């Protein structure tokens, strides 16, 4: 019996951080190990170029780092197909066919695109590739006939746009070639949108407010000890706030069930007064090191042979291209574009 297909991936614009880990990577590994799905995981370098077109080297260099992060967290090339988007030219051809099914006005109404255009400050100079990348995402998803796409809740409009394209294509050509995907969204919204160490809503390289999977133990310690807490909690005996306190936010996200009572007790003591920030940060450091230490060690081991890392990705890309090629052939057949025997 054919397994349901999952497609997921990341833009390779730098090393991945713990926001990526709790928001998607950890769940991908769980889904992989269930062995109920055929999983495709891709490095979306073409999508990253939509706002890094003049700095492609950043993307190229990031491919290796993101691949290391994938392997370190437990994604296994023998269980999941890991590939590079630009190595699958069939995706670009699918995008071209789908563009004829989507109006410019519809693209401009996409809430996710509108938000990202505002955040990136494009003004009137919006790259065409950026505006149409929801169509490229639809090509990525449909090329592998993905049944499920794990994404953050902010990506719901993208999934809906893909579903619209699938319906438009199948209706226009009276076929059922394309599969309508469903989004898989984080159950823990706090994990799905992990804020930065400084309390900023976004953890990012540009803001220098993230913990990266590649960070060594000393770097992790320094970052945790510098985290934003309650600025009015000056003395240990002062009552403190846990709302907006990044240490407690991270404890809620990374704590395991067996940690729940200790975390609850710490919250009560902190709010009452009598618990200092240094102690809460040290406790968080223990919990993070428990989670990230093994990942760090695996990453170091994989990094010793980057040739083998790229070999794994090449094999995955070859398999992905075979699958995408079959879908493209079916799409062209439905459109009547097979001219020769």
Curated annotation (Swiss-Prot):
It is found in: Cytoplasm. PANTHER family: TRYPTOPHAN--TRNA LIGASE, MITOCHONDRIAL. L-tryptophan binds at residue 140. A motif ('KMSKS' region) lies at residues 202-206. It holds the Pfam family tRNA-synt_1b. ATP binds at residues 11-13, 19-20, 152-154, 194, 202-206. Gene3D superfamilies: HUPs, Tyrosyl-Transfer RNA Synthetase. GO terms for biological process: tryptophanyl-tRNA aminoacylation. This is Tryptophan--tRNA ligase.
């Amino acid at each position: 019996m054919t397994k349901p297909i999952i497609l997921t991936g990341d833009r390779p614009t730098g090393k991945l951080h713990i926001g990526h880990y709790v928001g998607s990577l950890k769940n991908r590994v769980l889904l992989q190990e269930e062995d109920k799905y055929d999983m495709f995981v891709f490095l979306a370098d073409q999508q990253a170029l939509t706002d890094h077109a003049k700095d492609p080297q950043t993307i190229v260099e990031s491919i290796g780092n993101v691949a290391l992060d994938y392997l370190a967290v437990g994604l296994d090339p023998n269980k999941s197909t890991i590939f590079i988007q630009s190595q699958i030219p069939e995706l670009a051809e699918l995008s071209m066919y789908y563009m004829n099914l989507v109006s410019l006005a519809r693209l401009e109404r996409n809430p996710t695109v509108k938000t990202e255009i505002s955040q990136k400050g494009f003004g009137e100079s919006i790259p065409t590739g950026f505006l149409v990348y929801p169509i490229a995402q639809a090509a990525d998803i449909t090329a592998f006939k993905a049944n499920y796409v794990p994404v953050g809740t902010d990506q719901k409009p993208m999934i809906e746009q893909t579903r619209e394209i699938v319906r438009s294509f199948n209706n226009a050509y009276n076929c059922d070639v394309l599969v309508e995907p469903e989004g898989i969204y984080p159950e823990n919204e706090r994990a799905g949108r992990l804020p930065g160490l400084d309390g900023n809503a976004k953890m990012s390289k540009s803001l220098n407010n993230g913990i990266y999977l590649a960070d060594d133990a000393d770097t992790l310690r320094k970052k945790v000890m510098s985290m934003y807490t309650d600025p009015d909690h000056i003395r240990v005996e002062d009552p403190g706030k846990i709302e907006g306190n990044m240490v407690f936010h991270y404890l809620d996200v990374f704590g395991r069930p067996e940690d729940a009572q200790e975390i609850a007790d710490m919250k009560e003591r902190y709010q009452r007064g009598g618990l200092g920030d240094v102690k809460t940060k040290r406790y968080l450091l223990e919990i993070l090191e428990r989670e990230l230490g093994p990942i760090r060690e695996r990453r170091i081991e994989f990094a010793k042979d980057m040739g083998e890392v790229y070999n794994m990705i090449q094999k995955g890309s070859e398999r992905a291209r075979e699958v995408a090629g079959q879908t493209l052939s079916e799409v062209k057949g439905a459109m009547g574009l097979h001219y020769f025997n």
